[in-house]
A protein has these predicted regions:
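Internal alpha-helical scaffold of NAD(P)-dependent oxidoreductase catalytic cores
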Residues: 38-45, 123-168, 173-210, 254, ...
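NAD(P)+-binding Rossmann beta1-loop-alpha1 motif at the extreme N-terminus of oxidoreductases
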Residues: 1-55
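Interdomain hinge/lid region at the active-site interface
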Residues: 189, 203-262
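Short, hydrophobic beta-strand segments that form beta-sheet elements in well-ordered domains
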Residues: 29-33, 90-94, 112, 131-133, ...
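Rossmann-like NAD(P)(H) cofactor-binding subdomain of soluble oxidoreductases
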Residues: 36, 44-123
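Short phosphate-binding/catalytic loops that engage adenosine nucleotides
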Residues: 26-27, 107, 153, 193
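Phosphate-coordination loops involved in phosphoryl transfer and adenosine-cofactor binding
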Residues: 2-4, 87, 128
Length: 262
């Protein structure tokens, strides 16, 4: 059973996940971050010690949970292996990292991917967050599954391809949509209008999706009406904002292509 966990990282995912694991009864026996101050801040909230040195981490952890940027995962695992040996168990939290890369450093590795957007100061209802896991052995897969079920009511074992597909879809559904909100906000601010005016619209669109509507079935707007007059007027109004104009034009073409493909 996974009881002693070392958190590698101190960002949004490491913070939220570390706190949830701590609340669930896991013993967090150390926090590592490349920035000592950040390691100490997170460690204090988890009643453990923080460090920026791998040599100061405990070597008897049941799990080294790696929540760092993708480009740093391999380096971190290589250093953990050098410090504690080939037999440690480590799992990363990435949606797209190729787990097989870790096989050259450690015997057993896994994935603990939470499909949610995290910020340190916003505490989500973790029971509703989908958690996707995988591991290089059935034993560790079961261990991660048991750990995940203490946090979430939606735990699934998936393969690497499925995880990457989920990550791509999540980027579209969350990251890209949020960027579009940012674009909308900037356009409004430049014209002395408040972004809050769009909140009822955003809530209604979100409500329909949450309640089970097919996104394609509730699509509205000038693109699917083929209202070329309005589209051209909008594009002209965005002449002084070429980047936003490009986004508008590209998304409009995508909408029309998808809606009228049949």
């Amino acid at each position: 059973m996974i009881k002693k966990i070392t958190i590698i990282g101190s960002g949004n995912v490491a913070t939220i996940l570390g706190k949830e694991l701590f609340r669930s009864g896991c013993s967090i026996n150390g926090v590592w971050s490349r920035t000592l101050k950040n390691a100490m801040i997170l460690a204090e909230s988890l009643q453990t010690s923080g460090t920026d040195k791998f040599s100061e981490l405990p070597g008897d952890s049941d799990l080294y949970l790696i929540a760092v940027i993708d480009d740093a995962i391999e380096t971190v695992v290589a250093q953990l292996s050098q410090q504690f040996g080939y037999r440690i168990f480590a799992a990363h939290t990435s949606g797209s990292f190729r787990t097989e890369v870790l096989g050259q450093y450690i015997q057993n590795s896994g994935v603990f991917y939470c499909l949610q957007t995290f910020t340190k100061n916003s505490v989500p209802d973790f029971r509703n967050i989908p958690v996707f896991i995988s591991a290089t052995s059935t034993f560790y897969e079961n261990e991660l599954q048991n750990m995940a079920q203490n946090l979430s009511d939606c735990v699934k074992v998936i393969d690497e391809h499925q995880r990457k597909v989920l990550h791509i879809a999540a980027v579209f559904a969350n990251n890209f949509v949020n960027h579009i909100y940012t674009v909308s906000q900037e356009i409004l601010l430049q014209n002395n209008l408040d972004f809050k005016l769009l909140i009822p619209l955003i809530k209604e669109s979100s409500r329909k999706i949450i309640e089970g509507s097919n996104p394609a079935d509730i699509q509205t707007g000038p693109a699917i009406r083929r209202d070329s007059t309005i589209i051209e007027e909008h594009l002209k109004m965005l002449d002084d904002l070429p980047h936003f104009r490009e986004i508008y034009n590209s998304v409009t073409k995508s909408l029309m292509s998808h809606h009228f493909k049949n």
